[in-house]
Structure formats: C-alpha cells, structure tokens
Curated annotation (Swiss-Prot):
Residues that, per the record, bind [2Fe-2S] cluster: 86, 88, 115, 118
Protein name per its UniProtKB record: Methanesulfonate monooxygenase hydroxylase subunit alpha
SUPFAM superfamilies given in the database record: Bet v1-like (SSF55961), ISP domain (SSF50022)
Keywords (A to Z) from UniProt: 2Fe-2S, Cytoplasm, Iron, Iron-sulfur, Metal-binding, Monooxygenase, NAD, Oxidoreductase
Enzyme Commission (EC) number: 1.14.13.111
Function summary: Methanesulfonate monooxygenase (MSAMO) mediates the primary degradation of methanesulfonic acid (MSA) to produce formaldehyd and inorganic sulfite by initial hydroxylation of the carbon atom prior to spontaneous cleavage of the unstable hydroxymethanesulfonic acid. MSAMO has a restricted substrate range that includes only the short-chain aliphatic sulfonates (methane- to butanesulfonate) and excludes all larger molecules, such as arylsulfonates and aromatic sulfonates. All MSAMO components are required for enzyme activity.
Listed GO CC annotations: cytoplasm
InterPro entries recorded: Rieske_2Fe-2S, Rieske_2Fe-2S_sf, Ring_hydroxy_dOase_asu_C_dom, Rng_hydr_dOase-A
One protein family per Pfam: Ring_hydroxyl_A
C-alpha cells in the first residue's frame, strides 16, 4: 500500500479492539492526573531496598504520585514510611535525599525528624514529640498526640525491598505481587542482598512507553548484541505469562554470554538456587521491573513527572555475603549490560525518547499497535495487551478511545 493521506493515517487499524491504543493515553494531562489518583496512589511501589537504610535513624526521601515521602529505620529496626510533610503548616520536613538522623542538625535535635520552619519534632514512629512554645500558643487546645505525621503502609518483602502504598486499605502486598514473584522468591529470599549500583534517567517520554520496553521483546531488533547472539530457538520459545493486576513474567532463558563480542561465560557467579546464566524478568504494574540476569539483579522504579516526562531509577544488587572479588565481578557484569555506558539500557532509552518526541501534548492522536500474535512467546505483544486492558479497568477508560468508559476487549488480553 502506498503512503497514506491524513484520513487514512487517522483511520481505525484493521485489528480487533485491544490490539491498539490511542496515543492520548500517553499525552493527555487530564489522563495523567487521573493516573496518579487512580493508579499510583493505590499501587504498591518498591520505594528502596532495605540495604539503603542499614542503620537505625537512616532515612531516604522521594515522591509517589506527587506526594513527598520519607522512609526511616527506627531504633527498633523497623522500617516505616510517612508523608514528608509537617502537619503544622505543610512544610517539607526533610530536604535531603538521604542521610542519618542519629546526630543533630542545625535545625533539629538528634534522633528526631525536625521541621526547620517552626521547630516541630517527630520521632521515628511519626509521633509529634515537641511543639515549640506549645503552652504559650496552644494552651491545652492542641495536644501533641493529635498532630503526628501521616503514616503510610510499608512492608519489607520479596528480597528486602521496601514497599510503600499511599492507600490505607490496599490489597495486601502478598496478593498484589506474590504470584509473579513465585518464580524467584526462593532465590531472592535465600540470603540478604544489597545495592551496589544506582543511577537515574529523566526522559522526555511517558512512563508507560518505558514499561512497554520491558513487556515485549520484539524490540530486540534494536539491541545489537541480542540480535547477533541471542536469536536462537530457545530465545523464541520463551513465554510471556500474564498475572492479575497487570503484571507480566518473561520466562527463563540461558544467556550465551561467551558469544558476545568481548565477553566470556558468566557461569561462575549466580544467585542461590538459580542455574548459571539464567534470565528472569518480572514486570509489575504500573511501571516497576525486576530483571535477574546471571550474576546481577536490576530493579527499575518509575516516577512519572508529567505526561511526557518520567524519572527512572535503576539499581543493581548482589549478595551481601559477596567477597570483594565476587562483588567486583557482579559490578562489571551489571555495568557492561545495564550501566549508563553499557550495551543494552541506553538503547531502550533512545527508543522511548524517540517515541516521546512523536507523542507529546498538543500533537494529534496516533494509533499505537499491540497486535502481534505468536502464541504468547517472546515476540508476541500479549504483555502490552494485558497491561493496557488492566490500565483500562483501573482508569475506567478504553485504551483505544480514552473518551469512552472501559469495556472488555473483543480479543483476550492473555
């Protein structure tokens, strides 16, 4: 068929409902704001790993759905999460991205979260323990017990990751993610892990476009090393398995690292209960990824910053018991594939940056195809069909026409 005119370009694709989406799901500000309320304020987010809070009074800060969050480790060794907001005048309490509250700061006492604005102080359980000039200003009208921090649901699970949920009554974390994690649970929980690598990317694209790259592998044609070494029968036989809540599991596969130019086999270093050179990938709705590949575990967490902007945080993890030599080997293996200058990750970022360039607020809507059917194997796009079907349910919008309320697609999302 020749190149199309505008009417043909905008026509409904000759596919079934559920095999394509309207690009407004990536570009519309109203839809984005609704996603924060209906999805990100209801979903469990793997905020950090517990190894990033190794000591009592350590803390980390971030945001979820535009809400500032602080996670602390108390003297009782419990990890807790709170809104990083003073209940007095709405001031941000802790401005640092990480640190320790064990020692005093210029604006606060040791072992306290102190709001520098008016010197209100809170302990590691979120209790208000000090109000400056309390009796003079409030007499007996405002007891400290009534102005504690806003606590959040927080659990440490699935290999020591710290999960936070803004909803007071969410689905349990076990029900949320237990089933897709079953394939790796024994491995991840066999012994303590710790983070050895962190970097982040802020990309002008929609967060869902990034997650798409982890839900399908048809784009491996973009990855040079995958294309020249990995396209074999075992690769194409891998299955994409769908789970409740929009999660995806990409089946195991033995990676032949010794076929990569300049690489050698990585069979000498793995994780407990995992055969050498194995590769598992768990994609969690709405945009988190756990990727265990041979000797290194990678975890991605997205923070949507707008319809056309996302922050992606990348962590590499190994075993806490690693010898210095083993740790350096894991770092080298991780960074050669997934580091900022590795042979894989930057190619994915180039791909979604290009999509973000053509799908921006104000541009006309486009039809984005998810219609490949290959018996749910690695180049089937069933992972994306499943994801957007669940997205439609959460949002009560049809992905193929977000102006319409959701109804089940004619084709199964698998």
């Amino acid at each position: 068929m020749p190149a199309r005119n505008h009417t043909q370009w905008m026509a409904t694709p000759p596919l079934q409902k559920g095999e394509w989406v309207d690009s407004r799901v990536y570009t519309d500000q109203e839809i984005f704001d609704e996603e924060l309320e209906k999805i990100f304020k209801k979903a469990w987010v793997p905020f950090r790993h517990e190894s990033e809070l190794p000591k009592a009074y350590d803390f980390r800060t971030t945001s979820i759905a535009n809400e500032p969050i602080i996670v602390t480790r108390g003297p009782d060794n419990e990890v807790r999460a709170f809104l990083n907001v003073c209940p007095h005048r709405g001031m941000l309490i802790e401005r640092r991205p990480s640190g320790s509250l064990y020692e005093g700061q210029p604006s606060g006492n040791p072992k306290r979260m102190t709001c520098m604005f008016h010197a209100w102080q809170f302990d590691m359980k979120g209790n208000c323990v000090y109000i400056s000039r309390e009796k003079e200003g409030y007499q007996d009208r405002l007891p400290k017990e009534s102005v504690g921090l806003r606590r959040l649901r927080c659990e440490v699970k699935f290999g020591g990751f710290v999960w936070v949920n803004l909803d007071d009554n969410p689905i349990s974390l076990e029900d949320w993610a237990g089933e897709p994690f079953q394939c790796l649970r024994k491995t991840l929980e066999a012994e303590p892990m710790e983070v050895f690598h962190y970097h982040k990317a802020i990309v002008d694209t929609n967060y869902k476009l990034w997650h798409d790259t982890n839900c399908e592998f048809y784009h491996d044609f973009m990855h040079y090393h995958n294309r020249v070494t990995g396209f074999n029968d075992a690769y194409f036989a891998r299955k994409n398995e769908s789970f409740e809540h929009g999660h995806i599991l990409v089946g195991t596969f033995e990676v032949n690292y010794d076929q990569y130019e300049g690489f050698e086999s990585r069979a000498g270093l793995s994780f407990p209960h995992l055969p050498p050179n194995q590769w598992y990938m768990i994609d969690l709705f709405p945009g988190m990824n756990f990727n265990l590949r041979g000797s290194a575990l990678r975890c991605d967490v997205v923070t949507p910053l707008g319809p056309n902007k996302v922050m992606i945080e990348f962590r590499g993890l190994g075993l806490k018991s690693d010898t210095p030599e083993e740790r350096q080997t894991r770092i080298n293996h991780h960074n050669s594939i997934w580091g900022p200058f590795g042979r894989n990750l930057h190619e994915d970022l180039i791909g979604v940056q290009g999509q973000g360039t053509t799908m921006r607020p104000g541009q006309e809507s486009r039809r984005i195809l998810h219609g490949r059917q290959e018996n749910q194997t690695i180049h089937d796009e069933n992972g994306m069909r499943h994801y957007y079907d669940k997205w439609g349910k959460w949002m009560n919008r049809m992905p193929s026409n977000p102006e319409l309320p959701y109804n089940a697609p004619a084709i199964a999302a698998e």
